[in-house]
Amino acid sequence: MKAFEFPNSDTPIKRHKNVAVVGGGNVAMDSVRTALRLGADNAYIVYRRGMEELPARKEEVEHAGHEGVQFKILTAPVKVIGNKEGWVCGLECLEMELGEPDASGRRRPIPKEGSNFVLKVDAVIPSIGTGANPLLAQTTPDMQFTKRGYIAVESEATGRTTKKGVFAGGDIVTGAATVILAAGAGRAAGMAIDKFLKDGEWWDPNAPKPAEAAPAPVVK
């Protein structure tokens, strides 16, 4: 992975003239701005809610606008269109309108019937969230995972998994978070690994958790 050294690296960089990035987070802003810097004539953010609901930081959105990013808000992707050669030539979209707030507290997007249109692009970049690689659970049956597919650990203070000698930390445990938290998890796991190599002790994932202490009585 040496693309950062281009042009002194053999790592290929894909360049496109019309790029659509589906999503509204910080990574989506990074992707669409990078597309412009690589020479795209048009770079779009396709987002199904309004500008006020964009989850990206305000400064990210402002900087993207200053660089020339075009925002296709209240727009949901329907399907990617390809030509006979198998290359992307368009993105079919549907106009949306905002209804009542959903469980996240943001107003729920509702499709407008008959509002389909095609955005002419030659590249579509999905940026709609992150998740754990399902291969982890499929190939490691003797390790426990959470309902969302993340690795279960004793605690973030040790990073000890249910598989003896295996430690985990960062996004694969907490879900998408920050580099600082991941670095902290690595440091904590490093100390736990050092202890394990010295004494060989491991925790029992099946041991009952200690009961929480009852609250102290209030003395009047």
Summary of predicted features, one role per range:
Residues 1-16, 101-176:
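FAD-site-proximal beta/loop scaffold in flavoenzymes
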Residues 24, 47-50, 171:
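Cofactor-binding loop segments of dinucleotide-utilizing enzymes, especially the Rossmann-like FAD-
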Residues 31, 172-203:
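A conserved FAD-binding loop/helix module that cradles the flavin
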Residues 70-72, 92, 167:
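General small-molecule cofactor/ligand-binding pocket signal
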Residues 74-87, 95-100:
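A conserved short coil-to-beta-strand element within the FAD-binding core of flavoproteins
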